[in-house]
Amino acid sequence: MPFKKINIAIDGPSGVGKSTIAKQIANKFNYLFINTGSLYRAIAFFCQKNQISITSERKMIKHLPPNFLSLDFEGNVWLQNQNVSNLLRNDLISKNAAIIAQYPQIRKIVTEILQNFQKNHKGIIMEGRDTTYNVMPDADLKIFLWADAETRAKRRLKQNTFLNLETDFQEILKAIEHRDYLDMTRKTNPLKKTVDSIFLDTTNFTRDQIVSQISKLVFRKIGQFSLEI
């Protein structure tokens, strides 16, 4: 029996596990997973590829062609006629995406794409900063994930070690704290928890435990009983 479709928004700081957890929830309930940050990464990738400076929002906007960025209903990100979903994960793109994401006009472009995409559709789970109050303000279920910076840095270090990436814990911690500062202090749509979001502190819980907690919230929302203990 298929699950009833609702829309879910998951917010929280960098490195808290939003993507991993949202993907597991999406797979469990057969929902479509969208990483909203991938659109900012795609713009950063486009600028890098076309040698467009990101130091000035006004100048950058001039070089972005109309309708150059889109999503499909498998959650893939497209730049014009190219699926770039698997090309967006490197340190430079991450760094540039954090800069680009502070620009009001860029955030407006991305938000419009995401809102048009979800219009009249259910069964979508979106994760990303400002998802709960700007991108999906009418989501049926809103989750705000949290973990202290040190815990997030340890998780990132473990992940990098698994991927055979040489990284220093202090460098990771410093980068996470800097990203938190940028996200919390930016003028346009800063990182914050909304009144109607459910706060889950993941610091002392495993990923599977958090997935289980969120699953129970989803079951409750869709009016079905969970068999999970």
Curated annotation (Swiss-Prot):
The processes (GO biological process) annotated in the record are: pyrimidine nucleotide metabolic process
Question: EC number(s) on record?
Answer: 2.7.4.25
Q: Which residues of the sequence carry a binding annotation for ATP?
A: 12-20
Q: Name one GO cellular component term.
A: cytoplasm
Catalyses: CMP + ATP = CDP + ADP; dCMP + ATP = dCDP + ADP
Its subcellular locations are:
Cytoplasm
* Keyword Zinc among UniProt keywords: no
**From the record, what ranges are coiled-coil?**
none
Q: Could you tell me which Gene3D superfamilies the record lists for this protein?
A: P-loop containing nucleotide triphosphate hydrolases
Per UniProt, the keywords (alphabetical) are: ATP-binding, Cytoplasm, Kinase, Nucleotide-binding, Transferase
InterPro entries with a match to the protein in the record = Cytidylate_kin, Cytidylate_kinase_dom, P-loop_NTPase
Pfam families assigned to the protein according to its UniProt record, in alphabetical order: Cytidylate_kin
GO MF term list = ATP binding; CMP kinase activity; dCMP kinase activity
The answer to whether keyword Repeat applies is no
To which protein family does this belong? Belongs to the cytidylate kinase family. Type 1 subfamily.
Q: NCBIfam families of this UniProt entry? A: cmk
Q: Tell me which HAMAP family the record gives.
A: Cytidyl_kinase_type1
- Protein name according to UniProt: Cytidylate kinase
Instruction: Say which species the protein is native to.
Output: Mesomycoplasma hyopneumoniae (strain 7448)
Q: What is the lineage of its organism?
A: Bacteria, Bacillati, Mycoplasmatota, Mycoplasmoidales, Metamycoplasmataceae
What gene, per UniProt, encodes this protein?
cmk
